[in-house]
Structures are given as structure tokens and as C-alpha cells.
């Protein structure tokens, strides 16, 4: 755990650990409760001070945090009756994208999300959250299934990008991403996408053509990583901090630009500090967003999605 603590979050992480220890003591002995309340107040104040001044690149690092909750962590906490569906019916099952059927507040839904691994073995299995074409084709199969049965689609975005390997290109990586974009654009059911970590390039957008897009407070969403941008523009990867600032990839920038619709506040110290609290906060925003579209029919949902994306961007000059 200590190896996963980022330098700028160390003071807060240490206090959070002390809060957990004192909370356990207070549960057994109420005399510790005043001390616990004081420590929680100090922790919250320090976290607000530190996290209010984070640079864009520091927020990118938080979005990649090894302990951050992934799609399956949210599925475990938000849904019941989860049944995972595997394979694209053409080539193989890609474990870097998970999807299936679930019940959400009594409503049947289709869930699709990027899935990273924890530890070397699982990261190899999940390909570090970088999907192959078969992953996107699995997602398409689920989108079309949702459309056929009139089920809302909830997606979770968390990838550095689509896998750039030779095999992936030979099997039609760009075509698969394009087909996923088209499939999302035409389904007549409500779609809510949530950026829960790192949202990189077309590999992320293939799960992001939604009626509404939520973003967690310390997530990012971009056409390219800051390191990649710096390497291309300036031939200097060390300028990633500058690139992160110019790319406007943090949650407040994304909201201002209209790329996302809602920012979901994270627990003190970030979502990785408390998965249960992070899921509870997301649940409130996700349910409110989904139910806000209850009165829209299939054609209205498609038109709403079309107008949302046509409205992005602006002409300058």
C-alpha cells in the first residue's frame, strides 16, 4: 500500500490511516470519539488544502492510482444480479472490457466498462486495461442487445487507450472502435457514461457516446496522454506537466467545455481511499442522471445524443 502512495498525497494518506485506527478504537470505547472527531476534521481540512492546489498532471496521476476502484469494484457495490457476458462471437473474449446484465435500483440494465488489473498477473490478463478489437466488438454486441430489449446502458471509462499492438491492428482496431461509436450513436435507449479513472483517446470514446457523461472529481479524459502529447509536440516527454495543463483534461475543464455533464465529488483523499464511499457518491449521481431521461422515447434519445455531440467545440478566428 505504501508503494502506491503518491508523494503529494502522503500527508493526507497518513492521517487517513490514523483515522481508521482511531475509528476502530472508538467503536469499542466511546471515550475516543471526541479525539476521532477532531482528527477527522483536521484530515478533511488538510485534504482540502492539498487537493485544491493540485496541478493537472497530479490529477492525472491520481486518475491512474493503483488502488483506485475499477469497473468491477463499482459493479460489486452498485448492482445486483450481475451476469457477465463474454466474447465477441468472432475471435475471443477480451478481459480488458467487462460487460453484462445487472439490476440497478430494481431496473434491468446493461453494464459495460474497461477493467484494469491489480498486480502483475491480473494486469497481464486484463492487458493493463487496453482493449483489443474483440473487446470493442463485445461491447457492440452488448449495445445491440440492450437496444433489442430496451435496457438502459451504463458504461464505465478507465483506459489509457486502445491496445496498439500488431495483432490488434491486423484484426481491425480502428474499424472496431469506429463501429462501437456508430453502435452507441444509433441505439434507442438511454446511455450514461462515467469516467472513473483515466479516459484516453478513441479507446475511451468507444464507451463514451452517451446521452450524459459523468466524471469523477480526479478523473481525466483526453485525446492523448500528457506524456504522449509532450513527446509529439516538443519531442520532450519531460514536459508532460505543461501538456497536461494545455490539454484541459481535468474534471473542471471538461465541465466548462461541455464534454461532461456532471462532476462527482470523491471521498477525502480520492476514490482510492474509500471504495464504498466513492460508490455511494457515484450511485446518487448516476441514478439521478438515469431517471432524468425516463420520459424520452427511442427517437428522442438518439436525437438528444446527436445534438449533444454536435454541440461540442467552437470555431475560433
Curated annotation (Swiss-Prot):
Residue ranges occupied by any CoA carboxyltransferase C-terminal domain in the UniProt entry: 31-292
Molecular function via GO: acetyl-CoA carboxylase activity; ATP binding; carboxyl- or carbamoyltransferase activity
Protein's cellular compartments: Cytoplasm
Keyword field: ATP-binding, Cytoplasm, Fatty acid biosynthesis, Fatty acid metabolism, Lipid biosynthesis, Lipid metabolism, Nucleotide-binding, Transferase
Gene Ontology CC terms: acetyl-CoA carboxylase complex
Catalysed reaction, written as an equation: N(6)-carboxybiotinyl-L-lysyl-[protein] + acetyl-CoA = N(6)-biotinyl-L-lysyl-[protein] + malonyl-CoA
Record note on quaternary structure: Acetyl-CoA carboxylase is a heterohexamer composed of biotin carboxyl carrier protein (AccB), biotin carboxylase (AccC) and two subunits each of ACCase subunit alpha (AccA) and ACCase subunit beta (AccD).
Annotated protein name in UniProt: Acetyl-coenzyme A carboxylase carboxyl transferase subunit alpha
Gene name, Swiss-Prot/TrEMBL: accA
Amino acid at each position: 500500500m505504501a508503494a502506491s502512495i503518491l508523494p503529494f498525497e502522503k500527508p493526507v494518506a497518513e492521517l487517513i490511516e490514523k483515522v481508521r485506527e482511531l475509528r476502530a478504537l472508538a467503536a469499542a470505547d466511546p471515550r475516543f470519539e471526541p479525539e476521532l472527531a477532531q482528527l477527522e476534521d483536521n484530515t478533511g481540512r488538510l485534504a482540502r488544502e492539498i487537493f485544491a492546489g493540485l496541478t493537472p498532471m497530479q490529477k492525472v496521476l491520481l486518475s491512474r492510482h493503483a488502488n483506485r476502484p475499477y469497473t468491477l469494484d463499482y459493479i460489486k457495490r452498485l448492482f445486483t444480479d450481475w451476469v457477465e457476458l463474454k466474447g465477441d462471437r468472432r475471435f475471443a473474449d477480451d478481459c480488458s472490457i467487462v460487460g453484462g446484465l445487472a439490476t440497478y435500483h430494481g431496473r434491468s440494465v446493461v453494464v459495460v466498462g474497461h477493467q484494469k488489473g491489480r498486480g502483475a498477473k491480473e494486469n497481464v490478463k486484463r492487458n493493463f486495461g487496453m482493449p483489443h478489437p474483440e473487446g470493442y466488438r463485445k461491447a457492440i454486441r452488448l449495445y445491440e442487445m440492450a437496444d433489442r430489449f430496451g435496457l438502459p446502458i451504463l458504461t464505465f471509462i478507465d483506459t489509457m487507450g486502445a491496445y496498439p499492438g500488431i495483432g490488434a491492428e491486423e484484426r481491425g482496431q480502428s474499424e472496431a472502435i469506429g463501429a462501437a461509436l456508430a453502435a452507441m450513436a444509433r441505439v434507442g435507449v438511454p446511455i450514461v457514461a462515467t469516467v472513473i479513472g483515466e479516459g484516453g483517446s478513441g479507446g475511451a470514446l468507444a464507451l463514451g457516446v452517451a446521452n450524459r457523461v459523468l466524471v469523477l472529481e480526479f478523473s481525466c479524459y483526453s485525446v492523448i496522454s500528457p506524456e504522449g502529447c509532450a513527446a509529439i509536440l516538443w519531442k520532450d516527454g519531460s514536459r508532460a506537466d505543461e501538456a497536461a495543463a494545455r490539454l484541459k483534461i481535468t474534471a473542471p475543464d471538461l465541465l466548462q467545455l461541455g464534454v461532461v455533464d456532471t462532476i462527482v465529488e470523491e471521498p477525502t483523499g480520492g476514490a482510492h481511499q474509500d471504495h464504498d464511499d466513492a460508490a455511494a457518491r457515484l450511485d446518487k449521481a448516476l441514478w439521478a442522471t438515469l431517471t432524468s431521461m425516463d420520459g424520452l422515447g427511442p427517437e428522442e434519445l438518439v436525437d438528444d445524443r446527436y445534438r449533444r455531440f454536435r454541440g461540442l467545440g467552437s470555431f475560433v478566428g
